[in-house]
Amino acid sequence: MTNNVITRFAPSPSGFLHIGSARTALFNYLFARHHNGKFLLRIEDTDKERSTKEAVETIFSGLKWLGLDWNGEVIFQSKRNNLYKEAALKLLQNGKAYYCFTSQEEIERQRQQALENKQHFIFNSEWRDKDPSIYPTDIKPVIRLKTPREGSITIHDTLQGEVVIENSHIDDMVLLRADGTATYMLAVVVDDHDMGITHIIRGDDHLTNAARQLAIYQAFGYEVPSMTHIPLIHGADGAKLSKRHGALGVETYKDMGYLPESLCNYLLRLGWSHGDDEIISMTQAIDWFNLDSLGKSPSKLDFAKMNSLNAHYLRMLDNDSLTSKTVEILEQNYNKLLRKLAYRKEFEGNTERSTAAYIDIREDASTGLTYKLPLTVELPKKFKVSEQEIGYIKQAMPSLLVRSATLLELTRLAQIYLVDSPIIYNQDAKKIIENCDKNLIKQVIENLSELEQFDKESVQNKFKEIAAANDLKLNDIMPPVRALITGMTASPSVFEIAEILGKENILKRLKII
């Protein structure tokens, strides 16, 4: 099937949009776009207990952020049960399925018995071939597939090759529950057929499902879509990706400061290649993508490579875009903190602008930033970076950029230029300030106060003079000065920062000591 290609992404809305699921969506999107076909979105929410509206919105926002736009309306399985029920009854009428009245307790008893006997358990229902005339009337049955007892099922996988499963290893799976709702297996097959899916591209953890679904396809007499089961993403240690390996959800990567173009490029290269090309735009990916270039081995998540790739895409943005994105994150996280503080009753009535009146944003690890805000009786309702501060950030952007691999790192450095908020000192900076020569800092303040020209070169020359007068090297003076001005121990050039912020702001920060 190559004409009128239709692929689908079919996540279960039970949590975040997993990074592995995002890659699956990307591959389906690229394959469809490469063939001028359709990329459809289906929400598999048949499990009512685990499915949430919040998870659905997370899936939508994650796909939109990545730029993976789908065709047509979203299909919700929870709204299609009548279609599934009709399909199950059709199999029943054709002798391909049967009513089963066996209780779950009896099935569990048989399962436990097989376990005790160290036997592989396949449930064989006593109702498979019984005459309907003896069906009990006081028990609601399930509908089970009448899987062939003999022969085998062959999965023709474009990546894995031919995978043969003996029918004796496939149970008579439930198609319709006793309450009339469809199971995942039935819904998937009916939907793929009804939606006209031509190619199924998904993780190889679905390979066992494929055999069971193939049995349903055969029972209906449906044409089977082309199947491609791709290896899962693993952690750097080679184990299956889990929380201990780092971020799992797409939204988290967004919060960590990765660009969507960068993440798509990185995910594309996890299991697919085009020669030695590493930097691949979405346009190129659509032109080049094919199933023949998929790898058979699991790919390992590598944050160093991800950061390197993201740094490349950051440098492709112009100054205005970088400044705009940085300011947006600053405002989002400041306002997130304000909303959080609005519920902190222990700070009500605290009017002192002292250390005790600050709360560290590090308590909220999801932002990744280290803001502190003064607390007064009335917290500001909304924080906004001033036009002056935006100007500072824009001017400093080239030097901030060379030290950043993500927008979050860029934003952390940009805090240096927020002159209307208190300076933030990290722990190392605090130690340097506590142990520094206070008299030397006073000399620095006095000398800088006398400067008429406060450009980078003039400030640097003045520091050289101070160092010489005290028989010191420039590197002996700069650590505490840097700590006081930036709150950090590593930053862009202090002389450049001084030129951008100006004398008044620099002296204000130095005088804190």
UniProtKB/Swiss-Prot annotation:
Principal place of residence: cytoplasm
Annotated family: Belongs to the class-I aminoacyl-tRNA synthetase family. Glutamate--tRNA ligase type 1 subfamily.
The protein, known as: Glutamate--tRNA ligase 2
Key words, A-Z: Aminoacyl-tRNA synthetase, ATP-binding, Cytoplasm, Ligase, Nucleotide-binding, Protein biosynthesis
Domain of life assignment: Bacteria
Residue sites binding ATP per the record: K243
Gene Ontology molecular functions: ATP binding; glutamate-tRNA ligase activity; tRNA binding; zinc ion binding
Enzyme class: ligase
EC number annotated for this UniProt entry: 6.1.1.17
Gene from which the chain derives: gltX2
GO biological process entries: glutamyl-tRNA aminoacylation
Subcellular location: Cytoplasm
InterPro entries (UniProt xref): aa-tRNA-synth_I_cd-bd, aa-tRNA-synth_I_codon-bd_sub2, aa_tRNA-synth_I_cd-bd_sf, Glu-tRNA-ligase_bac/mito, Glu/Gln-tRNA-synth, Glu/Gln-tRNA-synth_Ib_cat-dom, GluQ/Sye, GluRS_core
Subunit note: Monomer.
UniProt catalytic activity: tRNA(Glu) + L-glutamate + ATP = L-glutamyl-tRNA(Glu) + AMP + diphosphate
Motif residue range(s): 'KMSKS' region: 240-244
Function recorded in the entry: Catalyzes the attachment of glutamate to tRNA(Glu) in a two-step reaction: glutamate is first activated by ATP to form Glu-AMP and then transferred to the acceptor end of tRNA(Glu).
Example of a GO cellular component annotation carried by this entry: cytosol
Motif range ('HIGH' region): 11-21
